């Protein structure tokens, strides 16, 4: 019977079943992102701005693989069909994100792969990124229990990339890079779903008696907010439209939302900035994905026999 339960699918987690269905409905593909107008926008941007976004997309492109490694390690601790099915879908979407980031980098570096790799080598040695990665590595090593591992994963999903998405969203405010902005909408929407999944994993699969103290969790989030602020602040000198006050407020509001989602009180009690450029992160613009033109987002199955 144990063998049958392990290999014969039955719905064993309605919450993750629903998230998997939502992922199916929200599927999209790299070919849907048209960067032809974005190429022309490069000449409208300052050198400092272009270099900043090269840096962000190089970081994000490499980070997608890191997330999939973390998922592989996390799933070892859970025997649940619906959890595994959901995370298979999430890993597939992370691969889509990685391909889109490659296409964007290809556009930014004008199809010069050697220049892209050379730039990526420099990014890996960058002090701001090193501090961020060292902090994250220390927290991953520190996480011994299942609860701590899930919390670190939740933190990665919810905080580790969010200030980068915010800065990319500012391109829309500048009136440039429509394809990149659309990709950022799709990806930030996906990452919101991934963050909801990590919260669901913690809330439903980690018994309350096994969870760390609220003080421990809040301390972890406070450190993450400071690390993320320092990461962006180090790279945004001379970059237009970036306000560190707004980014800090956004990060604090995001941390509060994440804490609330795992049944803990808000710590910062901050509100996101009114000018928040992100559509799908639950910060200020409550626009439903399905209220946008469905033809922009949906793939249609033709002659499906």
UniProtKB/Swiss-Prot annotation:
Subunit-level organization: Heterotetramer composed of a homodimer of the large subunit (R1) and a homodimer of the small subunit (R2). Larger multisubunit protein complex are also active, composed of (R1)n(R2)n.
Record key words, sorted: DNA replication, Host membrane, Iron, Membrane, Metal-binding, Oxidoreductase, Transmembrane, Transmembrane helix, Viral latency, Viral reactivation from latency
Function (record text): Ribonucleoside-diphosphate reductase holoenzyme provides the precursors necessary for viral DNA synthesis. Allows virus growth in non-dividing cells, as well as reactivation from latency in infected hosts. Catalyzes the biosynthesis of deoxyribonucleotides from the corresponding ribonucleotides.
Substrates-to-products reaction catalysed: a 2'-deoxyribonucleoside 5'-diphosphate + [thioredoxin]-disulfide + H2O = a ribonucleoside 5'-diphosphate + [thioredoxin]-dithiol
Source species: Alcelaphine herpesvirus 1 (strain C500)
Entry-linked InterPro entries: Ferritin-like_SF (IPR009078), HSV_RIR2 (IPR034715), RNR-like (IPR012348), RNR_small (IPR033909), RNR_small_AS (IPR030475), RNR_small_fam (IPR000358)
Active site, per annotation: 101
Primary location recorded for the protein, binned into one broad class: host cell
PROSITE patterns reported in the protein's UniProt record: RIBORED_SMALL (PS00368)
TM region positions: 150-170
Protein name per the record: Ribonucleoside-diphosphate reductase small subunit
Assigned protein family: Belongs to the ribonucleoside diphosphate reductase small chain family.
GO BP: deoxyribonucleotide biosynthetic process; DNA replication; release from viral latency
């Amino acid at each position: 019977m144990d063998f049958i339960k392990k290999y014969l699918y039955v719905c064993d987690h309605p919450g993750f079943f629903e998230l998997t269905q939502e992922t199916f409905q929200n599927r999209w593909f790299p070919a849907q992102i048209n960067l032809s107008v974005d190429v022309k926008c490069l000449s409208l941007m300052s050198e400092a701005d272009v270099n900043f976004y090269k840096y962000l997309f190089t970081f994000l492109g490499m980070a997608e693989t890191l997330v999939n490694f973390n998922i592989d390690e996390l799933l070892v601790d859970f025997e649940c069909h619906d959890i595994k099915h959901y995370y298979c879908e999430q890993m597939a979407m992370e691969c889509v994100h990685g391909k889109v980031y490659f296409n964007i980098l290809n556009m930014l570096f004008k199809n010069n792969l050697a220049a892209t790799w050379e730039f990526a080598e420099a990014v890996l040695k960058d002090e701001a990124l090193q501090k961020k990665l060292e902090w994250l590595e220390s927290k991953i090593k520190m996480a011994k229990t299942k609860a701590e591992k899930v919390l670190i994963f939740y933190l990665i999903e919810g905080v580790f990339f969010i200030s980068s998405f915010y800065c990319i969203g500012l391109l829309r405010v500048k009136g440039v890079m429509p394809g990149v902005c659309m990709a950022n909408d799709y990806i930030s929407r996906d990452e919101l779903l991934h963050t909801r999944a990590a919260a669901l994993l913690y809330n439903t699969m980690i018994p309350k008696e096994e969870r760390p103290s609220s003080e421990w969790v809040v301390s972890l989030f406070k450190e993450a907010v400071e690390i993320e602020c320092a990461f962006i602040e180090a790279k945004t000198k001379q970059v237009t439209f970036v306000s560190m006050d707004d980014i800090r407020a956004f990060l604090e509001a995001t941390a509060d939302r994440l804490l609330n989602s795992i049944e803990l009180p808000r710590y910062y009690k901050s509100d996101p900035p009114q000018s928040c450029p992100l559509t799908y992160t639950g910060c200020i613009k409550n626009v439903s994905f399905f209220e946008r033109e469905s033809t922009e987002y949906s793939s249609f199955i033709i002659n499906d026999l």
